[in-house]
Amino acid sequence: VVDGPFAVINADDYYGVNAYKMIYDYLSSGEDNEKYRYAMVGYMLSNTLTENGYVSRGICDTDENQCLTGITERTHIEKTKDGAAFTEDDGKTWVPVALDTTVSMNLFGFTASMLKELESRFSAFLTENLEKNPMKCEYFLPAVVGDLIGEGKAEVKVLKSADRWYGVTY
């Protein structure tokens, strides 16, 4: 049973020592107030790219206080001679992305309130999605985070890491 702050990571990723310290320090420094108080470690896109093809990354938008306002998933980002670019039409057109763009690699820090939110939304998610495509029905954590931000219930501080991120599996 989780009754305090906790971090969520992808099991097959290496985030760097500094990322864990930042999440720990943030979660240790306060509690929920009028909004849920969450955090996400953000990385520079350049520190998450591979030489082996393309990657999927969540491009982060933040406000003046470095709080997350949205994540846009880009499923095909590649290194280019000028930096990086993404495509949404199988390479017919490419849109440049700055190498210092902040991306999410799914390292989040939450208070116990997140578990209540996930549980309260899960039944509606299944009702809405399971019938459409049961083999691909996936409850995406960043989607719930985005919903909570949009509803004004949560504030997600983006903690910027200079560490290099590594995917352990390929």
Label the model's feature ranges.
Residues 101-102, 157-163:
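Catalytic beta-strand/loop signature of glycosyltransferases that borders the donor
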Residues 11-14:
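The conserved acidic donor/metal-binding loop of glycosyltransferases
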Residues 1:
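Active-site-proximal specificity loops/subdomain of glycosyltransferases
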Residues 17-108, 112:
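Conserved core of the sugar-phosphate nucleotidyltransferase
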Residues 109, 156-159, 167:
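Conserved active-site beta-strand element of glycosyltransferases/polysaccharide synthases
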Residues 6-7:
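Short aromatic/hydrophobic "clamp" motif used to bind/position activated sugar donors
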Residues 119-154:
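A C-terminal functional module that forms or caps the active site or interfaces directly
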Residues 170:
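Glycine-rich, charge-dense phosphate/pyrophosphate-binding loop(s)
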